[in-house]
């Protein structure tokens, strides 16, 4: 799905292998807060290796004696990885259950603490990653490329995981927009997200191709750093250009839905021209009830560091909620993901 999308730093020449083993992809979830210690929800921090999020949630539900719907999470995480994440269990008026019964070589309970609010999808600050890429080839320019990514970021593309194996989530969305009924709410949400993500990626790629990844268009919608607050100005002012250059604001692209574009003027015209061939997709998203939203055009990994030794690269960084680690790797090298006989299940936070 991402083969035709533009690269911010040009197509990479280095090659490597991602996830040769689970320990090569480490994800530590950061909620951005500590559970308060009281309330009717139990937050459980779990370390899992080679297990998917939904399956572990089912084990927790059985151990706690509750319905599966009573167990929630902030985000799905890659299966073939070592991940630490939080689960929430709704247990009003009940004592804490013995969750140690689910522990095994691949599952460890790290922390259990009560909280007064439900753990919801997206209810997190972000994720810390430690990636080990092996079998490096043609890596002569890798050091300078790493530096460029640390300084300028990468396209904030939605990763392959969003679209399903072979793009099957998009095929399902297309069928749904053509009238096929999808009764499963989770599947319906998955297919809508895939369609919306494809349109976002198309606009980001088009801006990069036109040399507009770091350049303001009149009417661009920008987002304040560290928040989801957005605004647009009719013209390109020196003040706004300086704020963009300093990182105080970020360029954005639309996540399609009902309502008017938050951009205006030349920027809105550009976005509409890119999406003109996707009229049926836009119409389908609007009829499904999704509202317009914005997402940063670029993604700058935080606290990025690396160690390059021979044919192995160890790369660590932090990404905010909604960002994909694989989008960072894509800009860095042509990484072949080891096939372990199952589809990786991951959310936007773990690239997963």
UniProtKB/Swiss-Prot annotation:
**Which GO MF terms does the UniProt record name?**
RNA binding; tRNA pseudouridine(13) synthase activity
Give the highest taxon in the source lineage. Bacteria
Please name the Pfam families in this protein's record: TruD
The broad enzyme category this protein falls into is: isomerase
- Enumerate the active-site residues: 78 (nucleophile)
Task: Supply one GO BP term.
Answer: tRNA pseudouridine synthesis
Q: Where is the TRUD domain?
A: 153-299
Keyword field: Isomerase, tRNA processing
Catalytic reaction(s) noted: uridine(13) in tRNA = pseudouridine(13) in tRNA
Do the record's keywords include Transferase? Answer: no
User: What are the EC numbers?
Assistant: 5.4.99.27
Read off the PROSITE patterns from this record.
Answer: TRUD, UPF0024
User: Which Gene Ontology cellular component annotation is one that this UniProt entry carries?
Assistant: cytosol
Q: State whether keyword Isomerase applies.
A: yes
Family recorded in the similarity comment: Belongs to the pseudouridine synthase TruD family.
Tell me the PANTHER family matching this sequence.
TRNA PSEUDOURIDINE SYNTHASE D (PTHR47811:SF1)
Summarize the protein's role.
Answer: Responsible for synthesis of pseudouridine from uracil-13 in transfer RNAs.
Q: What is this protein called?
A: tRNA pseudouridine synthase D
Please name the gene that encodes this protein. truD
């Amino acid at each position: 799905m991402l083969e035709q999308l533009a690269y911010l730093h040009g197509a990479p020449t280095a090659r490597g292998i991602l996830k040769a083993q689970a320990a090569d992809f480490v994800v530590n979830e950061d909620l951005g807060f500590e559970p308060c210690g009281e309330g009717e929800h139990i937050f459980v921090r779990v370390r899992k290796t080679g297990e998917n999020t939904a399956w572990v949630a089912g084990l927790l539900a059985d151990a706690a004696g509750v319905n599966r719907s009573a167990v929630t999470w902030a985000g799905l995480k890659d299966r073939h990885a070592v991940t630490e994440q939080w689960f929430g269990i709704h247990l009003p008026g009940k004592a804490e259950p013995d969750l140690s019964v689910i522990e095994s070589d691949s599952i460890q309970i790290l922390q259990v603490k009560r909280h007064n609010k439900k753990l919801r999808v997206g209810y997190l600050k972000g994720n810390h990653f430690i990636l080990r890429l092996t079998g490096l080839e043609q890596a002569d320019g890798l050091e300078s490329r790493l530096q460029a990514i640390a300084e300028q970021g990468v396209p904030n593309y939605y990763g392959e995981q969003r679209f399903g194996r072979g793009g099957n989530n998009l095929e399902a969305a297309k069928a749904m927009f053509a009238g096929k009924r999808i009764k499963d709410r989770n599947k319906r949400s998955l297919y809508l997200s895939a369609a919306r993500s494809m349109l976002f990626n198309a606009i980001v790629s088009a801006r990069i191709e036109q040399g507009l990844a770091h350049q303001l268009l009149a009417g661009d919608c920008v987002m304040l750093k560290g928040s989801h607050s957005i605004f647009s100005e009719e013209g390109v002012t020196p003040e706004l250009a300086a704020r963009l250059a300093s990182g105080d604001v970020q360029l954005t692209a639309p996540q399609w839905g009902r309502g008017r574009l938050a951009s205006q003027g030349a920027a809105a015209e550009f976005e509409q021209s890119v999406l003109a061939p996707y009229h049926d997709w836009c119409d389908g998203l609007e009829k499904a009830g999704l509202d317009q939203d914005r997402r940063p055009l670029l993604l700058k990994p935080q606290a990025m560091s690396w160690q390059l030794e021979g044919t192995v690269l160890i790369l660590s960084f932090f990404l905010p909620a909604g960002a994909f680690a694989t989008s960072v790797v894509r800009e860095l090298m042509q990484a072949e993901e080891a096939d372990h006989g199952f589809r990786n299940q991951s959310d936007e936070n773990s690239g997963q």
